[in-house]
Amino acid sequence: RLRRQRQMCIRDSHKGEKKSAAEVIMTQLHAGGKFDHNSYKVSGGLHGVGVSVVNALSEKLELEINRDGKKYFIEFKNGESKSPLKVIGKSKNSGTQITFLPSKEIFSSIKFNPNILIKRMRELAFLNKGIKILLVDDSQKKEKTSEFKYDGGVLEFVEFLDEKREKLQNKNGNDLFKKAVYIEGNKNNIELECALKWNAGYSEDIFPYTNNIHQKDGGTHLLLSLIHI
């Protein structure tokens, strides 16, 4: 509608989902943040399907949200909500907790592999310097806690990957590269961090990550990074 004083008014007839945002995200595909530069500055994902797929493949999933002094709760069974999101108490905390049980009807094994989780948590801690990640395994008789925190970020990541490899030395036996080379920059809203180090090996190992997702086959992101470097 065009109004006086050069104003324009736009109104749609969107019916709304008639359910909480939490339930929409957990039960509908493509409900993610897409390409928002703030939401996806460091997080992975693209099509908004991740957590809704986890829910769909779970026999049971519980979602707890601590926000604005309240604790919210909603429970799902086989991907469907058992009841709407509700307030179950007060909370001084902030954040979200998801507890899920994979479906035995879909997966041949629903046992989690701690070694895979440890490797992934370590990667995330390296890629997000300063963040602390705790992995607590109480599935066994004796509880085991692994803590990951690396203030050096990708620079420390390269040192970790290189620590057991043969060093490149001169004829006097001195290491030629005691520290990894570190490069960082920002161009056109794209941030780049790079660390590299030479050793005595004859082939390179490249570990490219985009928004914390390992791209083992390289691709455009790696190519553009090498061009800018």
Labelled PLM ranges:
Residues 28-29:
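Conserved catalytic core of Hanks-type protein kinase domains
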Residues 25:
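Short basic (Lys/Arg) and small-residue
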Residues 4, 73-74, 81-86, 203-211:
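Short, well-ordered strand-loop elements centered on a beta-strand within folded domains, enriched
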